[in-house]
Amino acid sequence: MEKDTELHCSFCGKEQKHVSKLIAGTSGYICNECIELCHDMLLSDAVETPEVESTEQQKLPTPHEIRAHLDDYVIGQDYAKKVLSVAVYNHYKRLRSDKQITDVELGKSNILLIGPTGSGKTLLAETMARMLNVPFAMADATTLTEAGYVGEDVENVLQKLVQSCDYDVERAEQGIIYIDEIDKITRKSENPSITRDVSGEGVQQALLKLIEGTVASIPPQGGRKHPQQEMLRVDTSKILFICGGAFAGLDKVIEKRVHVGSGIGFSAEVKSKQDKATLSQLFEQVEPDDLMKFGLIPEFIGRLPVVAPLAELDEEALVKILTEPKNALIKQYQALFSLEDVALEFSPEALTAMAKKALARKTGARGLRSIVEAILLDTMYDLPSLQHLEKVIVEASTITDNQPPTLVYKA
């Protein structure tokens, strides 16, 4: 009878007197030996599971490889791609060489992208981060204000980066932050003002420390539950900052300095006709003094040593953007239509008409999606309900005269 009532492990069957510990559950018992065995099994599984390589363990692509990857997704902007490829390579090479080089401190190569709206500034930064497999966060400079004022604090930019990698601080410190519309936070005049400029020069001052490198404190995941809770400490000296802006009017500042097309009377008229043709050439000649005249403070310019100018996209480039990149707009919509077993075709004239429309709107590549979406809206609305539809053909008249696309049905 005593044997029947003796407690034993439900897994191995050993009696209580033969083990050190027997833990009770809702419908059985488990001994310390079985717990240790399970622990060892779980531990061995964890060791066998391959870990995701950290940024430092991954092979760093060369500038040529970075450029080739950018070519797959971004049309044109050859000069900007070369500048970016070298700057990004040097930045991550610096991070990896910190442990090897002790006698020389390598400077940080933050980047300033200058180019018209829709020329590919944001796309370049996003593509770069995706290729390098590093955390990426984007912020709009126009929403930022100094701490204590209505608006978004500059530290929130850092919070977005840490959130993008599930609060893994070490991984976040290898990331890229892109700040758009940086030209909108220029100070209102060249002379320092005695009044507070919380959304212009004030934001530049607030961004300075983050960009040059500091140890910033941000709230932990879910925010601080009580005042004593520790904040997360993030070293921004390893984070690559890329700032971008259209800098409308900067070309006039550069033009004035280099005396391109300067003159009066008839020569002034010739100059105005050549403005668009020389925009990228002028941006390539930009100097720190030009940016100061535009409204960036000297300290801020000094933290962005690498300047990559982008050219205004012409009609030919916009047509290529529609069709050539790996994730080209036309390819995306063709894939959508293929899910309904329908082919989607665009005539060469239709592509040209869309490019011309985007140029007229002055939206660059950014405006192409809204144009394609508008001309295909009615067709996509009816598509799931149309029986035996085989092909949809978009002609130039669909864009220029608002004619519906041609629908071809199976015989």
UniProtKB/Swiss-Prot annotation:
One of its GO terms (molecular function) is ATP binding. GO terms for cellular component: HslUV protease complex. Transmembrane segments: none annotated. GO terms for biological process: cell division; proteolysis involved in protein catabolic process. Gene3D superfamilies: 1.10.8.60, ClpX chaperone, C4-type zinc finger domain (6.20.220.10), P-loop containing nucleotide triphosphate hydrolases (3.40.50.300). Keywords: ATP-binding, Chaperone, Metal-binding, Nucleotide-binding, Zinc. CDD domains: RecA-like_ClpX (cd19497). Residues 1-50 form the ClpX-type ZB domain. Zn(2+) binds at C9, C12, C31, C34. ATP binds at P116, T117, G118, S119, G120, K121, T122, L123. It comes from the Bacteria. Belongs to the ClpX chaperone family. Component of the ClpX-ClpP complex. Forms a hexameric ring that, in the presence of ATP, binds to fourteen ClpP subunits assembled into a disk-like structure with a central cavity, resembling the structure of eukaryotic proteasomes. ATP-dependent specificity component of the Clp protease. It directs the protease to specific substrates. Can perform chaperone functions in the absence of ClpP. This is ATP-dependent Clp protease ATP-binding subunit ClpX. It comes from Pasteurella multocida (strain Pm70).
